[in-house]
Amino acid sequence: MFNFKSSDKDAVMHLEIYTPEDKSNLKGMIQICHGMTEYMGRYDKVAQYFTSKGYVVCGIDIIGHGHSLQNGSRKAYLGKKGSWEYVVKDVHTCYTEMKKRYPKLPYYIVGFSMGSFIVRDMLLSPHLRTKIDGCFLIGTGSQP
């Protein structure tokens, strides 16, 4: 577990990191970006499966979700108008933090539902430098 200040300068983001027991032969990293009303804890079994195969798995509870839910804030509330950009930047901060820790590992990202829109925005943003080796968009739509 790792916490960092959100790009909104208010929320504290909760980054969950799952690592294989045997760290001698790591195959890659998988970042999960969850959907609306979810949190990283819902992906524990998925993370356990991939760590058993040699992958480091990570993801944040986005603003208004899971451990990133602030006292008194509403569940699934992303913030005031314009907050979408903060959410995208926070997911990118997770990417940046994990690349610092494991710079040589291949990097894959999975976005589910709303998380797929976040991932698409992050990858298409010209000001966020993101280099990944694979992307899985699950339950996405045609327009974010």
What are these regions (language model features)?
Residues 1-22:
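N-terminal cap/lid segment of alpha/beta-hydrolase-fold proteins
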Residues 79-99:
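Alpha/beta-hydrolase active-site loop
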Residues 34-38:
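Active-site glycine-rich loops that stabilize anionic/oxyanionic intermediates
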Residues 102-113:
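Alpha/beta-hydrolase fold nucleophile elbow
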Residues 118-144:
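Alpha/beta-hydrolase-fold enzymes
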Residues 47-74:
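Conserved alpha/beta-hydrolase
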Residues 27-31, 106:
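Alpha/beta-hydrolase fold active-site loops
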